[in-house]
């Protein structure tokens, strides 16, 4: 079983890197199908039943794409850290400034 690794340790590393690369490529390929496919248009001269089926599929597709996501993304206002606007506030006692040369 280990006859393919009978050479040096470098060949084992090459095999492990190749396997890791294959696993990474397969995991990326599965991530591409995260969104559903767009429904196919039935054409201009399609019967009413096909058009109704198509419109239902489009409505379902739009509902899936635009659904609300719950969790950290439900904030109504964007998160801005307070230290960015710290100088714009009137309270400067918590952030003293040394403008005099006496400290040197």
From Swiss-Prot:
Chain positions listed as propeptide in the UniProt record: 74-104
Q: Which PROSITE patterns match?
A: PANCREATIC_HORMONE_1, PANCREATIC_HORMONE_2
GO annotation (BP), single: neuropeptide signaling pathway
Q: Where in the cell is it found?
A: Secreted
Specify the superkingdom. Eukaryota
Q: Pfam families of this UniProt entry?
A: Hormone_3 (PF00159)
Q: List cystine links.
A: none
The UniProt keywords, alphabetically, are: Amidation, Cleavage on pair of basic residues, Neuropeptide, Secreted, Signal
Q: In which tissues is it expressed?
A: Lateral brainstem, dorsal spinal cord and retina.
Q: Which GO terms describe its cellular component?
A: extracellular space
Signal peptide, first to last residue: 1-34
> Which positions bear Tyrosine amide?
70
GO terms (molecular function) for this protein are: neuropeptide hormone activity; neuropeptide Y receptor binding
Family affiliation = Belongs to the NPY family.
Say what the protein does: NPY is implicated in the control of feeding and in secretion of gonadotrophin-release hormone.
Listed name of the protein: Neuropeptide Y
Organism lineage: Eukaryota, Metazoa, Chordata, Craniata, Vertebrata
């Amino acid at each position: 079983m280990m006859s393919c690794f009978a050479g040096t340790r470098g060949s084992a590393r090459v095999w492990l890197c190749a396997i890791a690369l294959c696993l990474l490529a397969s995991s990326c390929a599965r991530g591409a199908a995260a969104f559903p496919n767009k429904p196919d248009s039935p054409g201009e001269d399609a019967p009413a039943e096909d058009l109704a089926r198509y419109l239902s599929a489009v409505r379902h597709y739009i509902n899936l794409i635009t659904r609300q996501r719950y969790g950290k993304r439900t904030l109504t206002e964007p998160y801005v850290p307070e230290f960015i606007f710290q100088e714009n506030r009137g309270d400067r006692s918590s952030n003293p400034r040394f403008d005099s040369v006496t400290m040197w």
